[in-house]
């Protein structure tokens, strides 16, 4: 650089500025793509959470229907005049340990407690959180023109998007953990419902054969 004329130094400064500007544009483009991917992922997680809620509600409805079916079987036994020996009485399914462990009091296991996290810091796909730039800005100004203004703006947007990506990652992690717990609960409810249905079928067959 010492051997360059002032004109050549100025030309080189403009070349470096142009290259730096293009770099910040590429970085911003990649950051926006990453943010869009994050928003789509959170949207899909939210839709998946709604599906899990519907499935769990279905499990709860089956449980209620089976309660009514068991009452009907008991009434049919009485109507048919069947004398049931105390030792052969069917134990109330809901008094069992497995049932209580699965349904409990409906507190922490209810679908309403599985909260779907939304990207609270994202609005219409645009970064809403601003992170403080370094004192004096992100770049050291050389040409002090519109190109450096754009570079500063690009890097400011990148910083904001990075903050959003961090928050989205936390939201996704929390949502995935909550959904994994809900899937486990749905599996337990499905198993309990199956056992309850099997027991009811056995009672019905005995009633028919009697």
Swiss-Prot record:
MF annotations from Gene Ontology: syntaxin binding
GO biological process: exocytosis; histamine secretion by mast cell; protein transport
Main localization category: membrane
Tissue: Expressed in non-neuronal tissues.
One Pfam family here: SNAP-25
Annotated segments matching region Disordered: 104-135
Chain positions with N-acetylmethionine modification: 1
Covalently attached lipid (S-palmitoyl cysteine), positions: 79-80, 83, 85, 87
Gene3D superfamilies referenced in this protein's UniProt entry, alphabetically: 1.20.5.110
A Gene Ontology term for the protein's cellular component: SNARE complex
Described function: Essential component of the high affinity receptor for the general membrane fusion machinery and an important regulator of transport vesicle docking and fusion.
Protein name (record): Synaptosomal-associated protein 23
Organism: Mus musculus (Mouse)
Name of encoding gene: Snap23
């Amino acid at each position: 650089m010492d051997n360059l004329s002032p004109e050549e130094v100025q030309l080189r400064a403009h070349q470096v500025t142009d290259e730096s500007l293009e770099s910040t544009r590429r970085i911003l483009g990649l950051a926006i793509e990453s943010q869009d991917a994050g928003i789509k992922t959170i949207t899909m997680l939210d839709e998946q959470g709604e599906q899990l809620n519907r499935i769990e509600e279905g499990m709860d409805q089956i449980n209620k229907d089976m309660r009514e079916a068991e009452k009907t079987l008991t009434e049919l036994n009485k109507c048919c005049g069947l004398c049931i020996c105390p030792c052969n009485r069917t134990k109330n399914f809901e008094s069992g340990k497995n049932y209580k462990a699965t349904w409990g009091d409906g507190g922490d296991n209810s679908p309403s407690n599985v909260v779907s996290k939304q990207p609270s810091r994202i609005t219409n796909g645009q970064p809403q959180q601003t992170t403080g730039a370094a004192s004096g800005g992100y770049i050291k100004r050389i040409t002090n023109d519109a190109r450096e203004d754009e570079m500063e703006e690009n890097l400011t947007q990148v910083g904001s998007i990075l903050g959003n990506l961090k928050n989205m990652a936390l939201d996704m992690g929390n949502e995935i953990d909550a959904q994994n717990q809900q899937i486990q609960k749905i599996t337990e409810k499905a198993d309990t419902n199956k056992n309850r249905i099997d027991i009811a079928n056995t009672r019905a067959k005995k009633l028919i054969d009697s």
